[in-house]
């Protein structure tokens, strides 16, 4: 039982550190984008070592290819597309990598809320 609690505690600490590193990257980005990139890389190392998932709010804020911290309008272009399946297109302006995130769940949720009224 002690090993289970110890493992759980390590994962909690890792998630906390990931959150701290990403919030530091967000705060320091306007002054030093390279330092923000380093914070993202450190957060990814912590995540890999502890085998935990990065929270969704941070997962979409860095480039999967060059690990740059993405800020829409500065080093990332964000577009909404409806073709085939509704999705968000995020293009990293540092390396040119394109990431697509579907948002069907959000649309279904909105429809459901509309039907309830």
From Swiss-Prot:
Pfam families: Rpr2. One of its GO terms (biological process) is tRNA 5'-leader removal. Gene3D superfamilies: 6.20.50.20, Immunoglobulin FC, subunit C (1.20.5.420). InterPro entries: RNP4, Rpr2/Snm1/Rpp21. Its EC number is 3.1.26.5. Transmembrane segments: none annotated. GO terms for molecular function: ribonuclease P activity; zinc ion binding. Its main location: cytoplasm. GO terms for cellular component: cytoplasm; ribonuclease P complex. It comes from the Archaea. Keywords: Cytoplasm, Endonuclease, Hydrolase, Metal-binding, Nuclease, tRNA processing, Zinc. Part of ribonuclease P, a protein complex that generates mature tRNA molecules by cleaving their 5'-ends. The RNA is catalytic, but its KM for pre-tRNA is 170-fold decreased in the presence of the 4 known protein subunits (Rnp1-4). The protein subunits also decrease the amount of Mg(2+) needed for activity. This is Ribonuclease P protein component 4. It comes from Pyrococcus furiosus (strain ATCC 43587 / DSM 3638 / JCM 8422 / Vc1). The lineage of its organism: Archaea, Methanobacteriati, Methanobacteriota, Thermococci, Thermococcales. The gene is rnp4.
């Amino acid at each position: 039982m002690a090993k289970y609690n110890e493992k759980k505690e390590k994962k909690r600490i890792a998630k906390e550190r990931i959150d701290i590193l990403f919030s530091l990257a967000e705060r320091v980005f306007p002054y030093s984008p390279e330092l923000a990139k380093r914070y993202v890389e450190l957060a990814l190392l912590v995540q890999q070592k502890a085998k935990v998932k990065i929270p969704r709010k941070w997962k979409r804020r860095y480039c999967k290819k060059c690990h740059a911290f993405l800020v829409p309008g500065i080093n990332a272009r964000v577009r909404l597309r409806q073709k085939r399946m509704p999705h968000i297109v995020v293009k990293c302006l540092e390396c040119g990598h394109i990431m697509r995130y579907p948002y069907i769940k959000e649309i279904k949720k909105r429809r459901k809320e509309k039907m309830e009224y």
